[in-house]
């Protein structure tokens, strides 16, 4: 019994440790890169590996360019930086959605930002592409409806930020009826719910529009695209 007890305690401690938030910084004279990941994602090995791979890809150029710039023009140099902070936007027993608002400083006039996101199916251990939410042949119509709602949300947000209504065509720079022109999508939910209530489309400052406008987080309620969802995905939304 004592051995079993120790085994159970060890198992509990291992699970708790695996669910701890991850926070690691690498700092040199040329750059400082930091990666933070919510414990819920760290507890899923393949998801953790996906995030680590993205971070490695995103920081490769930062590391190379900063090291080169420090060597070639030290008098004008300040360290480059990249900070990714992955947070959960929704989770239930078989899905988890995360987003990261990345801070990027490449020794330019000002730092930049860029979002990234992942919707992960725990059952199949893979990223869910946006179009897979929709029934066969329905994705184009779904993206058209989502783009229309996103355009309205962007114009409202841009007007509030700038004080004047932008030209409607400005929205088209980053919004279109194509999953590659709908930012980075993540699932959203109301506190206490176990089902999603919509999606959010994420755009970092300077990623598409003028940096001075900051980032855009365009909330799209499920009612906009409900009719296009597969039966399985319809069941995931409230």
Model feature map: region roles:
Residues 5-15:
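Bacterial N-terminal signal peptides
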Residues 18-238:
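Compositionally biased intrinsically disordered regions enriched in Thr/Gly
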